[in-house]
C-alpha cells in the first residue's frame, strides 16, 4: 500500500531547507527583536516570516490540514490538537541563539494524525544537517541511519537539557536544583545547545543519552519526538509516565530504564498545558 503521508514528508523537507535559507540570509542583516512572555523569551521578524511562509505553502497544497505554529499561538491562536492531520511548526527553534549568532538554530516540522506522530523534520540551519523520522521507517540525518546509544548506566551518561526562558526565581531555583541532583548521582555531564529539537536529535544520534526539559511546547517536540523513537529511543513524561505532546514536559531517552532513573531526581515545575486556555 502506498504511504499516504510520504508526499507530505518530502514537501516538509523541501520547505525546511527553504526556511533554512531565509534564516541564514537573515543572519547577515540587522535584527528586529521583540519580547514575548519574559525578557528571555524572544521573537524576531524572521520567526514570523518563516512561519508565514511554511503555513501558507502547506495550506495551498493541503487545504484541509490543521496547523499549530509557535508564532500563530503567540499572536492569539489556540493550540488545539484534533484527529485531523496537523502540522506542528517551530519556525526558529533557538531564537535566542539566532539573535546572538550562536550556531545552533533549527526549523522544526512535526506531522500528527489522530494525535499520533507520523513524521518529523528538523533542519539545523547553520550546520546544514537534515534530521528526519518517519513512523515505522527509521530516523536519519542526511541519509545516514540514526541509532540511540546503548547506555543504560546513568553514571556513564551524558544528558542534554536547557535552562529555559523563565526568569522567575522559584522556577530558576528548581531547574538548577534538578541539575545539581542529577550531576551528583554522579553522571558524566549535562550539555545543551539552546534548542530542544536539536538536543533531542542528539539523543537520536547516540551522542547524548537522554534529554529532559519542562516548560517547552508541542512545537519544540513534535518534529524531533518521532526522530528519537524511530532511532530506538523512548519518550516519557517527566514523572516517568506516558508522554503527552501537549503537557510541556518530556524525557527523551535512549532507553526506558535510563529515562525512569532520571525522572526519580526531578522536581516538577507546575505548568499550564499547551491545550489549556
UniProtKB/Swiss-Prot annotation:
Mg(2+) 1 binds at residues 70, 90, 92. Mg(2+) 2 binds at residues 90, 93, 220. Its main location: cytoplasm. Pathway: Polyol metabolism; myo-inositol biosynthesis; myo-inositol from D-glucose 6-phosphate: step 2/2. Gene3D superfamilies: 3.40.190.80, Fructose-1,6-Bisphosphatase, subunit A, domain 1. It catalyses: a myo-inositol phosphate + H2O = myo-inositol + phosphate; 1D-myo-inositol 1-phosphate + H2O = myo-inositol + phosphate; 1D-myo-inositol 2-phosphate + H2O = myo-inositol + phosphate; 1D-myo-inositol 3-phosphate + H2O = myo-inositol + phosphate. It comes from the Eukaryota. This is Inositol monophosphatase 1. It comes from Sus scrofa.
Amino acid at each position: 500500500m502506498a504511504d499516504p503521508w510520504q508526499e507530505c514528508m518530502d514537501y516538509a523537507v523541501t520547505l525546511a531547507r527553504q526556511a533554512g535559507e531565509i534564516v541564514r540570509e537573515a543572519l547577515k542583516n540587522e535584527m528586529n527583536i521583540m519580547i514575548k512572555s519574559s525578557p528571555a523569551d524572544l521573537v524576531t521578524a524572521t520567526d514570523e516570516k518563516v512561519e508565514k511562509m511554511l503555513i501558507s505553502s502547506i495550506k495551498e497544497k493541503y487545504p484541509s490540514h490543521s496547523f499549530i505554529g509557535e508564532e500563530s499561538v503567540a499572536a492569539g491562536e489556540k493550540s488545539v490538537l484534533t484527529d485531523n492531520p496537523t502540522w506542528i511548526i517551530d519556525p526558529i527553534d533557538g531564537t535566542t541563539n539566532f539573535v546572538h549568532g550562536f550556531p545552533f538554530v533549527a526549523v522544526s516540522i512535526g506531522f500528527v494524525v489522530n494525535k499520533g506522530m507520523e513524521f518529523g523534520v528538523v533542519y539545523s540551519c547553520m550546520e546544514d544537517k537534515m534530521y528526519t523520522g518517519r513512523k515505522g521507517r527509521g530516523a536519519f540525518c542526511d541519509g545516514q541511519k540514526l541509532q540511540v546509544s546503548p547506555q543504560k548506566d546513568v553514571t556513564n551518561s551524558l544528558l542534554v537539557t536547557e535552562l529555559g526562558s523563565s526568569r522567575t526565581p522559584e522556577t530558576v531555583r528548581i531547574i538548577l536544583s534538578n541539575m545539581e541532583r542529577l550531576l551528583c548521582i554522579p553522571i558524566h555531564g549535562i550539555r545543551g545547545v539552546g534548542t530542544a529539537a536539536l538536543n533531542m536529535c542528539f539523543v537520536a544520534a547516540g551522542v547524548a543519552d537522554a534529554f529532559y526539559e519542562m516548560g517547552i511546547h508541542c512545537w519544540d517536540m513534535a518534529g524531533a519526538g518521532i526522530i528519537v523513537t524511530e532511532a530506538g529511543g523512548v519518550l516519557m513524561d517527566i514523572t516517568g509516565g506516558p508522554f503527552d505532546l501537549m503537557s510541556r514536559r518530556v524525557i527523551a531517552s535512549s532507553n526506558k530504564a535510563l529515562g525512569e532513573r532520571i525522572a526519580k531526581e526531578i522536581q516538577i515545575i507546575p505548568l499550564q498545558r499547551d491545550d489549556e486556555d
